[in-house]
Amino acid sequence: MRPSLVRLVRPRRPERKTSPILPPLKLYKALLRAHANKLPVELRPLGDQYVKAEFKAHKNIDNPLHIVGFLAQWQDYLKGIDGGEWINGKLSQQDLEKMSPEQIGQLHELMEEAKKAGASE
């Protein structure tokens, strides 16, 4: 039996399993839009301030690996917000092990601010 023409044709390049990374400005605007549409009103200012501060802090980074990692992580966060996964989201031990001490400190500060916001209700 001869193979069909469809089986002989191969794709020109492999398919991506992940979506391409959004440009920084589009990602930034999409994050703020997602906060406006998906987050509860009391959490929106906290989320917006954090996104703005992080993008401002990483504005002058020159290392392409850091840029790609930064944008990829924020894009994953955006998918979580859009999908509603943020409500029950948990950080795995593997993710914690990958973090630098500075990042763990930032995470702790974020946790404390979230607790303050929750206690003020």
Curated annotation (Swiss-Prot):
Main location: mitochondrion
One GO term describing the cellular component: mitochondrial intermembrane space
Transit peptide location: 1-35
Compartment(s) where it occurs, according to its Swiss-Prot or TrEMBL record: Mitochondrion matrix
A biological process term (GO) from this entry: regulation of gluconeogenesis
A Pfam family reported for this protein in Swiss-Prot or TrEMBL: Complex1_LYR_2
Alphabetized UniProt keyword annotations: Chaperone, Gluconeogenesis, Mitochondrion, Transit peptide
Superkingdom of origin: Eukaryota
Function, as annotated: Plays an essential role in the assembly of succinate dehydrogenase (SDH), an enzyme complex (also referred to as respiratory complex II) that is a component of both the tricarboxylic acid (TCA) cycle and the mitochondrial electron transport chain, and which couples the oxidation of succinate to fumarate with the reduction of ubiquinone (coenzyme Q) to ubiquinol. Promotes maturation of the iron-sulfur protein subunit of the SDH catalytic dimer, protecting it from the deleterious effects of oxidants. May act together with SDHAF1.
Oligomeric form and interacting partners: Interacts with the iron-sulfur protein subunit within the SDH catalytic dimer.
Family designation: Belongs to the complex I LYR family. SDHAF3 subfamily.
Name of the protein described by the UniProt record: Succinate dehydrogenase assembly factor 3, mitochondrial
Organism of derivation: Debaryomyces hansenii (strain ATCC 36239 / CBS 767 / BCRC 21394 / JCM 1990 / NBRC 0083 / IGC 2968) (Yeast)
